[in-house]
Amino acid sequence: MVSIAFYGGIPGGISTPITQQSEKSKCEENTMFQPYCYNNDSKNSMAESKEARDQEMNLKEESKEEKRRNDWWKIGMFLLCLAGTTGGILWWYEGLPQQHYIGLVAIGGRLNGSGQSNAIECWGSFPGCRPFQNYFSYETNRSMHMDNNTATLLEAYHREITFIYKSSCTDSDHCQEYQCKKVNLNSSASSNSVRVEDVTNTAEYWGFKWLECNQTENFKTILVPENEMVNINDTDTWIPKGCNETWARVKRCPIDILYGIHPIRLCVQPPFFLVQEKGIADTSRIGNCGPTIFLGVLEDNKGVVRGDYTACNVRRLNINRKDYTGIYQVPIFYTCTFTNITSCNSKPIISVIMYETNQVQYLLCNNNNSNNYNCVVQSFGVIGQAHLELPRPNKRIRNQSFNQYNCSINNKTELETWKLVKTSGVTPLPISSEANTGLIRHKRDFGISAIVAAIVAATAIAASATMSYVALTEVNKIMEVQNHTFEVENSTLNGMDLIERQIKILYAMILQTHADVQLLKERQQVEETFNLIGCIERTHVFCHTGHPWNMSWGHLNESTQWDDWVSKMEDLNQEILTTLHGARNNLAQSMITFNTPDSIAQFGKDLWSHIGNWIPGLGASIIKYIVMFLLIYLLLTSSPKILRALWKVTSGAGSSGSRYLKKKFHHKHASREDTWDQAQHNIHLAGVTGGSGDKYYKQKYSRNDWNGESEEYNRRPKSWVKSIEAFGESYISEKTKGEISQPGAAINEHKNGSGGNNPHQGSLDLEIRSEGGNIYDCCIKAQEGTLAIPCCGFPLWLFWGLVIIVGRIAGYGLRGLAVIIRICIRGLNLIFEIIRKMLDYIGRALNPGTSHVSMPQYV
């Protein structure tokens, strides 16, 4: 039976003949391209099965993927151990003890880590001076010390009680002359009644001699101990003790208190009275600025007690006096038991501050035996949350508005132990400091910046080579730069110290100017009030300092102080300019030395500088270490995959280019041949068995002898075969045969591992796969996600991949929008359905189908 061959077109491939065979031959049904079929079971088909190739490739990919998974598991465990070690080192580093914050030690701050609620805490305002609300605490190795010019409030109070210091001013409301007479207080042993008798020679009662004082109006009479008053020229005129020393209206505050580390004039109202409270574990707390304070006389001997039944008990006595008009103010009597009282001047009378939950009282106590004291509450002045009690009726304070304070201060040990992390800028402690070794690198915590720090730390491995280059080439230059840098640092530190001193003076000048403005406003208000109503009221502003009175302050005045400030500012300006000029010169020389054209070395310096500055910012937070580990793990595990993908892309682009050039060369060579006629081409295809005539290629690359021709063709004469061989040799050159036949033979060799096939089978197979991999097929594979190596060129692959990614993103967005619209439509339909049913139900209820309502009938 004669075989009839005709051409069928394969999209994208060469024209392949399809032959009609005998009925006995059965074609295999598992092949995609099958130009010939055979009835010999021992022979395989010529064309390669695509399914077999896909299965083989899938097996290879699964094997590689399994091996890759095992490798990455090992690498992941190694990175886990590495990150754990790094995290442990950083955790240890963060746990090292750091320097303390002592830049601002002020009442109004909170000590971090203190067992007490508020180590240093005050709330309040100052009428004459305005505190600075914002401070920047800094970490340094400066030492805190005290000298003759600076003293902390804790030292000034000696953990017991503050002094009410002298102020050369004598203008105060209660510091006025009183008309007093001596009286005796007599009581019977069986009653609590006490009689007041006018006598010349007085006797002690309750440990004190007594005076009955009033003013010219005789509107108010006060019964006070003689120890609270001072006689004037042996007459019946008395004034309260200490009027020229305490309770003075401030006209000029001594410059002896430090605001932070800056000396200023600080005026407060009212003065602070700090007392000591014994706590557990031998800790002391100095506190109390808020409760009502009965202002009184402070003797040299001082003590502090807590008002409870174990220390002091009130003695209720009835004072009997002859008839009087107006107000008669009597004292409050206490009996107290004190232990471990040491007198400073061997006097029996001491001043005691007794503080309770809601008030503080000043007591004058007289020792009647070893531990028992008779005490009386002092009469003059009530200061604190209440008001100043004025003796005369025409001197009243209207609309009283006084400051309230709530303070507590820990002992000095906690100030040196804990970090001050919060300040409110109310009243500072005077602390002086000096630099010992210079600047200290700050440990920072930037929160989200720790993520950046982890990424920078991960790049340190790559930077090691760069820094090796820097170390080899830049040693001398770096040493020279360091020398200039040290000079710049020293000059900068000196300049900072000078600027700090200048700022101290500047603060004092600013606050003094502010105080002057306040005084001018006050005077203006007083004059306006006087012009309107013809009388004025006195103000009560107290000057409180943290240092005993120095007689040299009496020679100070505003003019001399301003002259001194201006002179110091000019001197400091000159020193600062000189110092900064030297620092600028050293810095310029350092920059010139460091300005190198070696960009690699400069990059290494910058990189390691950033790494050194950012790594400490991780902080001692376990969350940040976890984030750092995850980022490092992700970066290191993804880098090989990314590099492998880039290598595939690069090699794929090279392979695509090579195949493209080979195909162009083949077509160019083939175009030079003469045009074939249809008969010659049919003869060539029929005699493809010996087309090459090269026994070397048949033995090395062919898997089996070519037996694809029909039985009728096998019976044809040998001369026809020889002519066909000659024609094949004249068409296919040696170079073309070598380039085309070897890939096909390699594929056959991979299938069965044995040679013997005709090399034209491999050539035909390559042509089918190469021509079938056109742009259309490549794009289809890329869209399906099965494209491993680009077969249509690297630029086109990138462009098509971008188009696919954009298309998928747009598709996801549109699908999400469709889902949202569908949900909204369902929700609206549900709402409309509910409304429809409600309206239908109401309508049916109002308009039933059958009415059961009977209309009334009128007969």
From Swiss-Prot:
It comes from Equine infectious anemia virus (strain Wyoming). GO terms for biological process: symbiont entry into host cell; virion attachment to host cell. It comes from the Viruses. InterPro entries: GP41-like (IPR000328), Gp90_EIAV (IPR001361). This is Envelope glycoprotein. GO terms for cellular component: host cell plasma membrane; membrane; viral envelope; virion membrane. The mature envelope protein (Env) consists of a trimer of SU-TM heterodimers attached by noncovalent interactions or by a labile interchain disulfide bond. GO terms for molecular function: structural molecule activity. The surface protein (SU) attaches the virus to the host cell by binding to its receptor. This interaction triggers the refolding of the transmembrane protein (TM) and is thought to activate its fusogenic potential by unmasking its fusion peptide. Fusion occurs at the host cell plasma membrane. The transmembrane protein (TM) acts as a class I viral fusion protein. Under the current model, the protein has at least 3 conformational states: pre-fusion native state, pre-hairpin intermediate state, and post-fusion hairpin state. During viral and target cell membrane fusion, the coiled coil regions (heptad repeats) assume a trimer-of-hairpins structure, positioning the fusion peptide in close proximity to the C-terminal region of the ectodomain. The formation of this structure appears to drive apposition and subsequent fusion of viral and target cell membranes. Glycans are attached at residues 40, 112, 141, 148, 186, 214, 233, 244, 340, 368, 399, 406, 411, 483, 490, 550, 557.
